[in-house]
From Swiss-Prot:
GO terms for biological process: tetrahydrofolate biosynthetic process. It is an enzyme of class 3 (hydrolase). This is GTP cyclohydrolase FolE2. Converts GTP to 7,8-dihydroneopterin triphosphate. Gene3D superfamilies: Urate Oxidase. Keywords: Hydrolase. Residues 1-27 are annotated as: Disordered. Belongs to the GTP cyclohydrolase IV family. Its EC number is 3.5.4.16. GO terms for molecular function: GTP cyclohydrolase I activity.
Length: 302
């Protein structure tokens, strides 16, 4: 049995600083409350983006790789521009619309986000709206010889902007891990060569009429990254697999510069990509520093 005789909970709250409510003088009816955000006046500058970020919600991901449908956690950012004559935006409307979509299952698809941004633009009474969602995308990966399976993942991002004047713009991004083996180390050494994990980030602007029913953009970017690496990463490797992966890496040495150029070539050949940015960071196994390289290319500039 407790030995202490404690005061009632209300008294404990008072002990730690709680005070009784004061007399209320401001209106409680919505139509009588001050609405500062909707104040119309010259506020000096138009704002490019106003909204909310770091919003986490469950989402449904569709994939051409197993698992074909998966539930993940989406991290959202919502925004719109506001003109000089508007003080602010209606922050609650971002969350209200997200909850509405989530209640029937929020699919992270280009078509869904197009519909969302156009509707959001109307609710905000602004000419544009942007939604960006980041999420971990899981995919099954089998050992090259044993076929022993496990799950890998990459960090994906999809951003859709609607503008009542110019239509939709679609940007995608994927960050994935790969293996790189140093060409210089292989060339100068009697045997062996140092190798390491590299992190590749591919950012691409898609054409407005991109057809996600025909092409899984996540898989297209993943293949561009992994197919140009010294070797792919695997969650499960038996001895026969490890031999194959090790030898493959030795046969395909890559500098960090090589990686971004080879990936850029693949993206350049994709007709549904209008511009892109590729960066690679190798966690050097024989140094304390990382090696980096990047490239940006806009096909429309040709």
């Amino acid at each position: 049995m407790p030995k202490k005789q404690l005061p009632p909970k209300e008294e404990r709250h008072k002990l730690f600083g709680s005070v009784p409510p004061k007399e209320r003088t401001k209106p409680i009816e919505k139509n009588k409350m001050a609405d500062l955000q909707n104040t119309k006046r010259d506020f000096l500058f138009k704002l490019d983006a106003v909204g909310i970020s770091n919003v986490k919600y469950p989402v449904i991901i569709h994939s051409d790789l197993a698992p074909k449908e998966q539930t993940s956690i989406g991290t959202f950012e919502f925004s719109s521009s506001i003109p000089t004559m508007s003080k602010g935006t209606n922050m609650s409307r971002f969350m209200e619309l997200l909850q509405e979509y989530s209640s029937s299952g929020m699919n992270v698809s280009i078509s869904e986000l197009k519909r969302f941004t156009k509707e959001l633009s109307g609710k905000l009474e602004q000419k544009d709206a942007t939604i960006e969602v980041s999420f971990p995308w899981f995919f099954e990966r089998k050992g090259p010889e044993s076929q022993s399976a496990g799950m890998n993942h990459a960090d994906a991002k999809l951003s859709v902007t609607y503008d009542s004047n110019s239509g939709f713009s679609i940007d995608v991004s994927l960050s994935a891990w790969i293996t790189t083996l140093c060409p210089c180390s292989k060339e100068i050494s009697e045997y062996s060569a140092h190798n390491q994990r590299g992190n590749v980030t591919l950012e691409a602007t898609l054409v407005e009429d991109f057809d996600e029913a025909k092409i899984d953009w996540k898989l297209a970017l993943l293949e561009a990254a992994e197919s140009n690496a010294s070797a792919r990463l695997h969650p499960v490797l038996k001895r026969t697999d490890e031999k194959m992966v090790t030898e493959q890496a030795y046969e395909n040495p890559r500098f960090v510069e090589d990686m971004v150029r080879l990936i850029a070539a693949d993206l350049y050949e994709m007709p549904f990509v209008s511009k892109f940015h590729v960066s690679c960071r190798n966690e050097e196994s024989i140094h304390m520093h990382d090696a980096i390289a990047s490239i940006t290319y806009d096909k429309s500039s040709e």
